[in-house]
């Protein structure tokens, strides 16, 4: 057996020890601002590399999408099954102003709704709001037992499913096409669209757990900073009354005309 040097043990390390640098010294924090349709306005912070030369920190922030639980945005645990997507559109100082970018339901909520013996009905459609946002809305519904029903299952017929799906699409299109995006988001929070679908489909087949499962933004209009800032500024309350609207007292007299008469 040939005896030789073990190259691995005899070889020393090249160079000295590397300097341990803290990565966070090159980064800075920015505050995230939610639109006024939500109760919590400051919903978190985001990290970004500091401006170095021509590479601006704001360029890295614009377009970032943040997924936030609706329970955290509205301080309501009953809304914990919904997730809201907010995109960073404008930065002022250390504040990132966001806008609505999508909605979805958590996986565990969706799994809890699907049960044996009930028909699952889904519908989706592309809609356009008054402020030229193109959205794709997905709706989900489940059948429920009729009153005094003895049968354990409640499966809907294919013809009934088609009618319900058509009703879903019509209601979603009607509700979205006549409002602005901010007003449409306000409808998503209390599930007013789902309640309307449930009400109108009652004659076809009784429904339960009708939800807007997902909302995707397909196309957005050109960014208007003034409109974006309107979403983040609360309307000022009127501090004073209109003087012209107040009724004039009967005892009030014009001093100048009174002196001329005398």
Swiss-Prot record:
It is found in: Cytoplasm. It comes from the Eukaryota. GO terms for molecular function: structural constituent of ribosome. Its main location: cytoplasm. One of its GO terms (biological process) is translation. InterPro entries: Ribosomal_eS1, Ribosomal_eS1_euk. Keywords: Cytoplasm, Ribonucleoprotein, Ribosomal protein. GO terms for cellular component: cytosol; cytosolic small ribosomal subunit. Belongs to the eukaryotic ribosomal protein eS1 family. Component of the small ribosomal subunit. Mature ribosomes consist of a small (40S) and a large (60S) subunit. The 40S subunit contains about 32 different proteins and 1 molecule of RNA (18S). The 60S subunit contains about 42 different proteins and 3 molecules of RNA (28S, 5.8S and 5S). PANTHER family: 40S RIBOSOMAL PROTEIN S3A. HAMAP family: Ribosomal_eS1_euk (MF_03122). Component of the ribosome, a large ribonucleoprotein complex responsible for the synthesis of proteins in the cell. The small ribosomal subunit (SSU) binds messenger RNAs (mRNAs) and translates the encoded message by selecting cognate aminoacyl-transfer RNA (tRNA) molecules. The large subunit (LSU) contains the ribosomal catalytic site termed the peptidyl transferase center (PTC), which catalyzes the formation of peptide bonds, thereby polymerizing the amino acids delivered by tRNAs into a polypeptide chain. This is Small ribosomal subunit protein eS1.
